[in-house]
Amino acid sequence: MAEPSGRYQQLPCEEEPEAGPQVAADAPPPYSSIAADSAAFFDYKDDAAFPNPPSYNVATSLPSYDEAERTKTETSVPLVSGRDDDFVARDDFEDADQLRIGNDGIFMLTFFMAFLFNWIGFFLSFCLTTSAAGRYGAISGFGLSLIKWILIVRFSTYFPGYFDGQYWLWWVFLVLGFLLFLRGFINYAKIRKMADSFSTLPRTRVLFIY
């Protein structure tokens, strides 16, 4: 029984001597080496390819509310270009202006319409036309129609006693008709002259009161 025990011998552990160097390899490097590497890294960051960030005061400085509103207003308002193009002389009025003023044909048409058909023709010609020539023609024709009927009633034998003792009323209607006739004719002549003078001036809008 002693022989088997003699065969087995305890061998020395080969891994135990290597434990010391492995522990030394797992230990962190010294602080001096880390500081040197960090300094080299930050020196590299100072190159032109990596500019320094702005300071805290510059990065955190925001404009005030008034400055922001003023900047927004200045950017939203468009620049006004030269206004010389708006004042270009025109050889004639536009079509819309011609429709508002009218021509001599419309004036004569509404004039005879109001003169022949009296107040019915006056209302039709005044309401159906939108030009100054048409309405002034209606006013002038109605004034002449009023003069016509005053003279008919005054000197006709079919209407006796209408102005007996009231000749002032006859004169009132006669003068009223004469004033309406002159007002329509003279105002239309002024408008035609004004249109000719405005044809070489900048764009102008004129309001005519009838």
Swiss-Prot record:
Residues 127-132, 183-210 are extracellular. It comes from the Eukaryota. This is NEDD4 family-interacting protein 1-like. Residues 1-105, 154-161 are cytoplasmic. The gene is ndfip1l. The chain crosses the membrane at residues 106-126, 133-153, 162-182. A motif (PPxY motif 2) lies at residues 53-56. GO terms for biological process: metal ion transport; positive regulation of protein ubiquitination; ubiquitin-dependent protein catabolic process; vacuolar transport. It comes from Danio rerio (Zebrafish).
